[in-house]
UniProtKB/Swiss-Prot annotation:
Organism: Drosophila melanogaster (Fruit fly)
GO cellular component: membrane
Coiled-coil region: 1-31
Name of the molecule in the record: Single-pass membrane and coiled-coil domain-containing protein 4 homolog
Annotated InterPro entries: DUF4519
TM spans (from-to): 31-51
Family per similarity comment: Belongs to the SMCO4 family.
Membrane topology recorded in Swiss-Prot or TrEMBL: Single-pass membrane protein
Keywords, ordered alphabetically: Coiled coil, Membrane, Transmembrane, Transmembrane helix
Keyword Transmembrane helix among record annotations: yes
Entry's localization field: Membrane
Lineage top rank: taxon: Eukaryota
Length: 58
């Protein structure tokens, strides 16, 4: 069997499926990853704030 030279053409169906997969992945990124990063950022800011504030003398 001979191998084809160059890139193999993508059919319309394959291209459509790939685009749908990319849209699903982007939706997951927006609904899972970004909120998780937001929570981590809030914890980091809170941690730094609590560690750098002056001690309260009782």
């Amino acid at each position: 069997m001979r191998q084809l030279k160059g890139k193999v053409k993508e059919t319309r169906k394959q291209k459509k499926e790939r685009k749908l997969d990319n849209l699903e992945t982007q939706a997951k990124i927006r609904t899972v990853v970004l909120p998780a990063l937001g929570v981590l950022a809030v914890f980091l800011v809170l941690f730094v704030y609590l560690k750098t504030r002056p001690a309260v003398l009782a």
